[in-house]
Amino acid sequence: MSREPTPALEYIRSLYAAQDDLLADIAAELKKRNIAIQIGAEEGKLLQLLIALHNAKTIVEIGTLAGYSAIWMARALPEDGHIYAINKDPEHVQMAEGFFARSECRDKITQLAGDAHKILPTLSQKGGGFDMVFIDADKISYPAYLDWAEKNIRKGGLIVADNTFLHGAMFEKAPPEGIAPTTWKNMRSFNERLADKSKYNATIIPTSEGLSVAIKLF
C-alpha cells in the first residue's frame, strides 16, 4: 500500500526507485480519487528484483487497480515475458487501460476484466505453469488464491502477496474492531500455510502492510 514517505523511504526511492512521469501520474490520479492503495515505489522495485532473480517470464497479477504494480513488473520482464492482470472494478479497468496504453511495455500486459474467481480457472486451462503470482486483491479470498497458485505456479516459482499484516490485525489474538472475523481468519490461514517449510521457503517482509514472498517447493 502506498504511504506517506518517511526519511528512509524517501532515501530509498531517490536512489533506487524513482518514479518516471507515467508512474507518478498513476500515483497522482489514485491520490486524487482517494484510492491510493497501490504498492509503494520501493515495493515496485523489489518486485522487479524478484522477477530478475527468478528469471520470471509469466506472471499473474490478482488485483491491478490502475496498473501501477503491473507496469513496474512488466518493465522487469524479458522480451518474451507477459503479465495477465486481473481487474474487477470497471472504473479501475478503464483507468488501467489508459495508463497501459502510454507504457512502452503495453504489449507485455493483458488486462482481464472481471472476478478473479471466474478468471483464474480460465488461465489454468491455458496450461498453467506460471512463474509468479502477485496477490493484491480482496483479503478474504487470499486462501482461495493460494489454492489456485498451488496448482498453477511452477515448482520454484514465486508467490508474492501484499497486505498480509492486514492493517496490523495479524498481531492480535482475535479480530480487532473494523476487521471482519472471516477476513481475519482467512488471512491467518494464508500466512500459516506459507509458513509450511515442506511446501514453501517464505517470509513476510516487514513493510508497513506486510509483503509475503514465498518460493513454491513442490
Where are these regions (language model features)?
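A short alpha-helical cap/connector motif
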Residues: 1-132, 139-160, 164-218
